Amino acid sequence: MAKKNMIQREIKREKLEKKYYLKRLAIKEQLKKTTSFAEKIELRQKLQEMPRNSAPVRSRNRCWLTGRSRGYYRDFGLSRHVFREMSHECLLPGVTKSSW
């Protein structure tokens, strides 16, 4: 189980991402369209003034049950440990153990 403060930090980052998403997108579009070097510097400065945690790069995928960040399966939103336990207990529909 991950520390509760780490889980809360990720939740805070997700909220900031959603809050600044449109603003960040608009600035990036302007940055692509402009050709003037001075304007590009100004727009990059605006991006840098935004909170760091509002950047989507800083968020980390975490298991929704335990908060574990490593061994994460995107399709299920679970870490490998929880995925294995739940699949053995038949709690994940359509998941079967392979054998050959």
Curated annotation (Swiss-Prot):
It comes from the Eukaryota. The keyword Repeat does not apply. It holds the Pfam family Ribosomal_S14. It is found in: Plastid, Chloroplast. Its main location: plastid. GO terms for cellular component: chloroplast; small ribosomal subunit. The keyword Signal does not apply. Belongs to the universal ribosomal protein uS14 family. This is Small ribosomal subunit protein uS14c.
